């Protein structure tokens, strides 16, 4: 599972997921899976989508993961009263804005890439679209 090795602070404020995305172009591979909606991806969701893609292409070609879960999400245990401090870190998320390229792929035919990204998109909680590299 993806998570930072070290962080400056253990816990962070909730914050807001506003603004425009960085990394909106396919830069490493030929095909990409781009976010259309806004949301957050957990490390488990990122890994599940990666596994689905890898199995679909039968381990040929190359896959790049363009998102990293660097925000800790805390939760308090069940049936615990309010107060007594912030809960423990339970999982890590990556905040996603519209236009962000989530995954890239190279070395496979376009039909296979579309199929693999379709399987991966089914694992993700945000709406996505298939994109190809634009040559200037």
Swiss-Prot record:
GO terms for biological process: translation. The keyword Ribonucleoprotein applies. Pfam families: Ribosomal_L16. Keywords: Ribonucleoprotein, Ribosomal protein, RNA-binding, rRNA-binding, tRNA-binding. GO terms for cellular component: cytosolic large ribosomal subunit. GO terms for molecular function: rRNA binding; structural constituent of ribosome; tRNA binding. PROSITE patterns: RIBOSOMAL_L16_1, RIBOSOMAL_L16_2. CDD domains: Ribosomal_L16_L10e. Binds 23S rRNA and is also seen to make contacts with the A and possibly P site tRNAs. Belongs to the universal ribosomal protein uL16 family. Part of the 50S ribosomal subunit. NCBIfam families: rplP_bact (TIGR01164). HAMAP family: Ribosomal_uL16. This is Large ribosomal subunit protein uL16. The lineage of its organism: Bacteria, Pseudomonadati, Pseudomonadota, Gammaproteobacteria, Enterobacterales.
């Amino acid at each position: 599972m993806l998570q930072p090795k070290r962080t400056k602070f253990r816990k962070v404020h909730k914050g807001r997921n506003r603004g425009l995305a960085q990394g909106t172009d396919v830069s490493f591979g030929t095909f990409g899976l781009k976010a259309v909606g806004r949301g957050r991806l957990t490390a488990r969701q990122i890994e599940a989508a990666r596994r689905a893609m890898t199995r679909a292409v039968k381990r040929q070609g190359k896959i790049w993961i363009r998102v990293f879960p660097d925000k800790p999400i805390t939760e308090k245990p069940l049936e615990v009263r309010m107060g007594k401090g912030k809960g423990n870190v339970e999982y890590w998320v990556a905040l996603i804005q519209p236009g962000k390229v989530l995954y890239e792929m190279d070395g496979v035919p376009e039909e296979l890439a579309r199929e693999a990204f379709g399987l991966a998109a089914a694992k993700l909680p945000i709406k996505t679209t298939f994109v190809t590299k634009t040559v200037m």
